Amino acid sequence: MPVSQSWWQVEVHCDPLLEDLLYWRLSEAGGRGFVCESKAQGLQVHSYFPAELWEETIRDRLLQEINADAADLGLPTPSLSWQTLDEEDWSESWKRHWQPQELGDRFLIQPAWLEPEPSDRLLLQLDPGTAFGTGAHPTTQLCLEGLETVPVADKVIADVGCGSGILAIGALLLGAKQVYAVDTDPLAVGATQANAALNDLEGDRFWTAIGSADQLQPLHAQGVRFDGFLCNILAHIIQALTPTLSELASPGSWAIFSGLLTSQADTVSVTLEEYGWVIRDRASQGDWCRLVADFRPER
């Protein structure tokens, strides 16, 4: 494959206080995966864009947005640079930057290409490929921590916007009976399937499909009862999917919502409550927020 048809590595140097907003801007622009390193001069963030998404208009808009964010916070102007990578270089670049990571009280996120060290934690092996979700992003961390607070064992769970599959696999490692994972990005679904195989979780317990929550409706019509939902997606998508999720839920179902900024949490909460969800926990990391909600339509 020609270099021009593969990947762009985008590198941003910025003040550490800009980290959370920068993750959000890169996600919205189409970035796949994030690597963050602390440097003496500040923060260095790498993200990876498919070649077709790194157009001049996207570059210009992203630069304007992050410069405006820095100005609003009174921070130095970030620097933005990029270079092309072929598939092999992309993979090797990713692997150089990513190391094992303990998350929550129970998980150890393990790069699949490294030999795991002995640990009493739940080993979650991962090769994210081009999909979002390594455990490095605050919203992924918040969701995994949230999973430790809800009933998972022997439950049926849906992961809407599964990315690399990290949350779906986490649920299975915690003893979920079945997990149904969907994503509108075919590359993400492929990564989820591959990561399930890495963790020996193929079979009847794990189901994937390309699409969104609408892919779960036929299953619900056939009698599948969803006990929990994982939604690490952007705020406006959570709001748009709330009616469908409410149709799929049963009284007592729970949901974990992240991918939203703390400044968006109140607006998202209002939408959820209009459709019968009760927010029982709210946590944040930097500018990012997680909501845990229970479905109680007959309050």
Curated annotation (Swiss-Prot):
Gene3D superfamilies: Vaccinia Virus protein VP39 (3.40.50.150). Keywords: Cytoplasm, Methyltransferase, S-adenosyl-L-methionine, Transferase. It catalyses: L-lysyl-[protein] + 3 S-adenosyl-L-methionine = N(6),N(6),N(6)-trimethyl-L-lysyl-[protein] + 3 S-adenosyl-L-homocysteine + 3 H(+). It is found in: Cytoplasm. GO terms for molecular function: protein-lysine N-methyltransferase activity. Its EC number is 2.1.1.-. GO terms for biological process: methylation. CDD domains: AdoMet_MTases (cd02440). InterPro entries: Ribosomal_L11_MeTrfase_PrmA, Ribosomal_PrmA_MeTrfase, SAM-dependent_MTases_sf. Coiled coil: none annotated. S-adenosyl-L-methionine binds at T140, G161, D183, N232. Pfam families: PrmA (PF06325). Belongs to the methyltransferase superfamily. PrmA family. Methylates ribosomal protein L11. NCBIfam families: prmA. This is Ribosomal protein L11 methyltransferase. It comes from Synechococcus elongatus (strain ATCC 33912 / PCC 7942 / FACHB-805).
